[in-house]
Amino acid sequence: MSEIKDIVVQGLWKNNSALVQLLGLCPLLAVTSTATNALGLGLATTLVLTLTNLTVSTLRRWTPAEIRIPIYVMIIASVVSAVQMLINAYAFGLYQSLGIFIPLIVTNCIVVGRAEAFAAKKGPWLSALDGFSIGMGATGAMFVLGSLREILGNGTLFDGADSLLGGWAKVLRVEIFHTDSPFLLAMLPPGAFIGLGLMLAVKYLIDEKMKKRRAETAPSAVPAGETGKV
């Protein structure tokens, strides 16, 4: 149970691929102009990570070490192609918005890295959990950044959610404030870098506060030989 908890905590927070490892920055910065786009790409990446880790772990005993990386890339490319066709079939608007960044998941360092570092050494279900946790950690970072940029840039939240979730999701659109002209800095790549920097700073502050709290609540160590002395 402790191993499962550690995998989840590492993926979601301590070893977050976007906020700690800083992997996959190209799609993270390019696609997160809206919360819907960020959520769509994040969920697609999570699905790819989960299925890839599961497949790599299942086949690890029959994968020659000398050619393991090309085999991993072939597995990842197959999974990404399947996910791309699913998005094209059931969320065409999102497919058009994400564009080239769906097939680029194949080259994402997160996916290849987890296949090599974790899935090739652990069992299928733990590997699938690792992929899901890492993917949801990245999705959370994308969603927060996308929401921040959309609110500051357009004054809305979940604009275009129907392209991801269907026609009923139009009711999710919220207008935070009205603006006649968008705040371009938030919508362009410089705004994405600034937003990511703020998120990194907030995570650092939270981690530091948690360290101080643990240090304050930790019982003070008793030096050897002092036990029993008055």
UniProtKB/Swiss-Prot annotation:
CC terms in the record's Gene Ontology section: plasma membrane
Subcellular location: Cell inner membrane
An annotated GO BP: electron transport chain
Entry annotated with the keyword Translocase: yes
EC number(s) reported in the record: 7.-.-.-
Bilayer topology term: Multi-pass membrane protein
Top EC class, one word: translocase
Keyword vocabulary terms for this entry: Cell inner membrane, Cell membrane, Electron transport, Membrane, Translocase, Transmembrane, Transmembrane helix, Transport
Transmembrane regions listed in the UniProt entry: 22-42, 63-83, 86-106, 125-145, 182-202
InterPro entries referenced in this protein's UniProt entry, alphabetically: NqrDE/RnfAE, RnfE
Description of how the protein assembles with itself and partners: The complex is composed of six subunits: RsxA, RsxB, RsxC, RsxD, RsxE and RsxG.
Stated name of the protein: Ion-translocating oxidoreductase complex subunit E
Organism: Salmonella paratyphi A (strain AKU_12601)
Gene name of the encoded protein: rsxE
